[in-house]
Amino acid sequence: MKPIRFFKPENLQLAKAILARYPLRFQSAALVPLLDLAQRQHGTWIPPTAMYEIASLAGVSIDYVHSLILAYPNDFFWRPKKPRVRICNSWMCQQAAEEQGNSNWDSQCRSVATKYGFDVENTGCLGNCFQGPAMWINDKIYGVNTKEKLVDIMEALTQKKN
């Protein structure tokens, strides 16, 4: 029986390029980038066909791939109906927001993001402390945020989506 291919030909080439970065004995280290590639191709979650193909490419068991997905449920098993905004809730970002006069940054962010149809969740430090308050939308981290900047970002993202 011929295995079912999950990756499109162009993404299969990317997957092979990702694997080529790692020595043969350590190709399991490529699992997170491969899962990310599969998620980008499929949408928002990792289907079983992708797990099987990734396991085959990396030379690991399907159980190993599945256990890695279970270790990162918010990244690989989450099936959002809407895009999401992750707000950094570290004390550095909270202090930066206070210094900018945004003492209620979290609630401002939530009200603006939900108005534009985004889900909002808190996250740990985004490593952008020098530009707080920080937030993470899709693959980009935004820093030195204000309510006005957030509105501009939301409008740009919703226009790009339409």
Curated annotation (Swiss-Prot):
Signal peptide location: none
First-tier enzyme category under EC: oxidoreductase
Keyword field: 2Fe-2S, Iron, Iron-sulfur, Metal-binding, Mitochondrion, Oxidoreductase
Cofactor(s) the record lists: [2Fe-2S] cluster
One GO term of the biological process aspect: cytochrome complex assembly
Cofactor note: Binds 1 [2Fe-2S] cluster.
Molecular function terms from GO: 2 iron, 2 sulfur cluster binding; metal ion binding; oxidoreductase activity
Gene3D superfamilies per the UniProt record, alphabetical: Glutaredoxin, NADH-quinone oxidoreductase subunit E
Documented EC number(s): 1.6.-.-
Primary site of residence: mitochondrion
Keyword Iron-sulfur recorded: yes
Gene Ontology cellular component terms for the protein in this record: mitochondrion
Pfam hit, one: 2Fe-2S_thioredx
Subcellular location: Mitochondrion
UniProt-annotated binding residues for [2Fe-2S] cluster: C88, C93, C125, C129
Family the UniProt entry places it in: Belongs to the complex I 24 kDa subunit family.
Protein name: NADH-ubiquinone oxidoreductase 24 kDa subunit homolog C11E3.12, mitochondrial
UniProt organism field: Schizosaccharomyces pombe (strain 972 / ATCC 24843) (Fission yeast)
